[in-house]
Amino acid sequence: MKLNFKQRNILLGTILMWPMMGIFLASLTNLLENDFFPEITGFGRFALFAFAGLLLSAIISFLIPVFSPMTRAQNEIMDELEQNGQTQRFIELTEQEINRLITTGKAYKHYQFFSQYVSLQADAFLIQHNPQAAIQSINRINLQDLQTYTGKVLADQQILGYFDVQMAIAEELCNADMANAVMRDASPYLQKVNEKNLGHFIIANEVYFCYYMATGNYAKAYEHARKYFDHTANRFCSFLGNSCSVKVFIKTGQFTEAERFLQNAEQQTTSTPNQRQILAYLRESLNRARAGM
């Protein structure tokens, strides 16, 4: 059985707290100088505190969402994303949490989550063919705040994701001026990307792809679509390579090729809700292009 986001969070929290809670209970017993089970010694005593620590950890992990609005919102948002994709309800959930963080003055304190929700929401608007709403959403974060308030471990990926959404908006609008402006800001970060870091490569390559699509250089865009096929061991990269190729051939009016790559993408999908939405978006785009011939 596959665990959802909330269940994985509870399990992870339980595992991480387990040793600490076991030690805490053993120390508390010694501090109180009250041995509740004096007849249990040796390994049995160790097992007792281990079990008690596990039970306490599980209870605490289960109760955290009850008392933490941020954790509760994160569970709802990520569960919706994993189970149904970037739906209208997903947009509403992210909007609620974004507004809560702003009104409570905690947006900068939890900027990693705030900026993630904004980027995901903007991307969801693009799936709905609503670039203007995506612009309004992504404009709630900026590069300087990402550099200042995002933790160092995730800062690079968050910044790349920010540029990725901006460039995707430029592509949707076919706005070369916007694409050039985004590229000027993004270039220093893109140049630092090491292709061995697959996560960063996937995002950076998509930024380049969207840039060339927005500026009408479809040959260069196709080169970047093909780069994903250098990582065919990763099924998601194959999916991206085919998906990006579909976009290129729609723009160039080569609908037979677009159909071929779309079918390849359908074969490469892992059937996540998000990938199904991307495929539906591409199918709709191809049908529109054919109807407009």
Describe the residue ranges of each PLM region.
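Long, non-transmembrane cytosolic or organellar matrix-exposed soluble domains/tails
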Residues: 205, 213-293
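Flexible helix-coil transition and linker loops at the boundaries of alpha-helical arrays
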Residues: 98-111, 143-157, 173-175, 189-198, ...
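Acidic, polar-rich low-complexity tracts and alpha-helical solenoid repeat scaffolds
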Residues: 37-38, 42, 50-51, 71, ...
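Alpha-helical adaptor scaffolds
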Residues: 164-234
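N-terminal alpha-helical membrane-insertion module
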Residues: 1-91
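"A position-specific structural signal for the A-helix of alpha-solenoid helical repeats
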Residues: 71-79, 113-123, 158-168, 200-211, ...
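Helix-turn-helix repeat elements of alpha-solenoid scaffolds
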Residues: 47-53, 80-103, 126-146, 173-187, ...
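Membrane-protein extramembrane domains
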Residues: 87-95, 99, 121, 250, ...
